[in-house]
Amino acid sequence: MIAVCIATYNQEAFIAQAIESVLMQVCDEAIRIYIGDDASTDGTSAICEAFAVQDERIQHIRRSVNMGLVSNTIELYRRIMADGCEYIAMLDGDDYWTDPRKLQKELDYLRTHPDTGFVHTAVEGQGDEPIPTGDLRDRYNLAGARHTNCTVLFRADLLRPNELDDIERQGFPVLDYPLYGLFAQRTRFAYLADPTAVWRDHSSVSQPSSRRARWHYRRERLRMWHWLDKKCPGHFHFRYDKAILWYIWHFFYILFA
């Protein structure tokens, strides 16, 4: 069973396209869609519920209070683990898949490479900034390699409840980097060059808009890299140093701009 994990909040303009892109998948493995609706206040909940009523593979889990992206996603992981799904595919509520065989291609790779637990692909960009390109390595390396979360498929047994608890306690602004950094200590990562998804990158969805919010976000990311550097000695020190330099530059930019 492949669990498709969709975390969403106030994305009524995008969520239907995201769900439909999963439903169009042609795959020889059963698919179940878990939608973590983080107490949306727009039309997102109604759209998700309409899909869930029509297709029993869709579980619409609407939070009674807003939990934030990290806790919302971790709660989905806990539910997926309890249901015994073997694989987890990630899809943010504002992105969508473009290749109807996206899951099948990634699944085939994992089946034929038992030493690999995580696969991601190229992506098409839609938004304010171009998709960064560069050296993408089989072994996850945050100093060089990049991933786009909407392309990721990984083995569910990589998840550890104690690690999820630890990350949640830290209160980081993002989940993918610290979690996948821990994954990299026990499995290989693979990159497939064919684009399979569209990633929307714009300020209203992907990043804080005010200077104060951006400052806080950068500071929290710096704390995240420091945590990873301690958890995985030798693997992320370069990335931590780079985050420090970026933090200093951003401080002076906000101070004098």
Task: Please place each PLM-identified region on the residue numbering.
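Conserved nucleotide-sugar donor-binding catalytic segment
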Residues: 121, 132-216
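Short beta-strand-to-loop acidic/aromatic patch adjacent to the donor-nucleotide binding site
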Residues: 85-94
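Glycine-rich, basic loop-to-helix element that forms the pyrophosphate-binding segment
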Residues: 63-83, 105
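Conserved donor NDP-sugar-binding/catalytic core segment of glycosyltransferases
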Residues: 100-131
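Conserved short acidic donor-positioning loop in nucleotide-sugar-dependent glycosyltransferases
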Residues: 10, 22, 38-39, 67
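Short, acidic, metal-binding catalytic loop of nucleotide-sugar glycosyltransferases
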Residues: 20-30
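A conserved acidic beta->alpha catalytic loop
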Residues: 37-46, 65, 92
